[in-house]
């Protein structure tokens, strides 16, 4: 997409093993997929194994039109076993010692990062020393003017205070959900109700935007100028896998296109609500959602 804003998802790329079959996943990958659908020049920095699952991922990314900075390494391609509860809420078992635990960005990936308008990352891929170092160093190469989106994505035991603190220091956008914000508050000794905690986090860090998503209970966007709250649309939920990642993509697309905060928020909410009505994390977005 010549002339489009350049965005990166760096971190895990994997197969979500859902009850009905496997789906391409990983939060930064889902973000990149939806960002591409929203007209951004989208890329993924990650790793896959030298196996059939890895080759399938590379082919999927290519067919989706996403720029691939995905290395093949001597580890198995990542998988996540997912079971859905009666409300379509996923429970994850994230397998360890896999390819995306050994991310080493190529020279071409770093060159792309040097020109990036936004980069999205989380805690999960930083569970290993190799990928932690690679992600932290890649963040240093992104222009100061870029959006550095820390979509915290706390999973299982794969996060700690050091990862969160060092990531937040490099971020200027934080996305966090209603469960994660309570864990965050406990780790960093922040007290108060949800709204007070949200504002303390925003005030204590150099953030342009804080996004708090609360599932069926709505969402907040906080900026220096205003707060925006929106209810979650009442939709028939197939599953919620990838809904938060699509919200992040909508948020980033709106910010890069300099839209008003309320308009950005509405778009992000509508995108994530649609994703909840579909199976898997990366359904094709209808045109009216992308406008």
Please identify what each model-predicted range represents:
Residues 9-18, 62, 226-236:
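Glycine/charged-rich beta-loop-alpha catalytic/anionic-binding loops adjacent to active sites
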Residues 15-16, 182, 282:
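Nucleotide phosphate-binding site architecture
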Residues 1-8, 60-62, 68-70, 86-226, ...:
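Ribokinase/PfkB-type carbohydrate-kinase core domain
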Residues 12, 46-50, 153:
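Cofactor-binding loop segments of dinucleotide-utilizing enzymes, especially the Rossmann-like FAD-
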Residues 35, 177, 244:
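Short, conserved phosphate/pyrophosphate- and ester-handling motifs at nucleotide-, phospho-/glycolipid
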Residues 1-5, 192-291:
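Conserved phosphate-binding/catalytic region of the ribokinase-like
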Residues 35, 44, 61, 119, ...:
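Hydrophobic packing within well-folded, soluble alpha/beta domains
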Residues 6-7, 17-89, 96-102, 291:
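Substrate-binding N-lobe of the ribokinase-like
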């Amino acid at each position: 997409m010549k002339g489009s804003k350049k965005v990166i998802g760096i971190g895990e790329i994997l197969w979500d093993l859902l009850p009905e079959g496997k789906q391409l996943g990983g939060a930064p990958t889902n973000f990149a997929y939806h960002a591409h659908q929203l007209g951004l020049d989208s890329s993924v920095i990650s790793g896959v194994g030298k196996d059939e699952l890895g080759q399938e991922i590379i082919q999927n990314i290519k067919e989706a039109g996403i720029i691939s900075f995905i290395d093949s390494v001597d580890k198995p391609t990542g998988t996540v076993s997912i079971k859905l509860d009666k409300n379509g809420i996923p429970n994850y078992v994230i397998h360890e010692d896999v390819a995306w635990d050994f991310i080493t960005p190529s020279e071409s990936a770093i060159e792309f990062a040097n020109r990036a308008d936004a980069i999205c990352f989380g805690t999960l891929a930083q569970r290993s020393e190799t990928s932690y170092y690679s992600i932290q160093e890649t963040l240093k190469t992104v222009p100061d003017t870029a959006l550095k989106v820390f979509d915290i994505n706390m999973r299982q035991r794969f996060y700690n205070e050091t990862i969160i603190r060092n990531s937040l220091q490099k971020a200027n956008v934080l996305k966090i959900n209603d469960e994660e914000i309570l864990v965050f508050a406990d780790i960093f000794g922040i007290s108060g109700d949800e709204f007070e905690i949200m504002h303390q986090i925003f005030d204590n860090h150099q953030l342009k935007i804080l996004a708090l998503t609360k599932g069926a209970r709505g969402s907040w966007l906080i900026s220096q100028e205003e707060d925006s709250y929106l209810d979650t649309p009442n939709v028939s939920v197939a599953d919620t896998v990838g809904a938060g990642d699509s919200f992040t993509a909508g948020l980033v697309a709106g910010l890069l296109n300099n839209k008003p905060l309320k308009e950005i928020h509405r778009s992000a909410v509508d995108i994530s609500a649609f994703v909840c009505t579909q199976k898997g994390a990366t359904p094709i977005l209808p045109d009216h959602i992308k406008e």
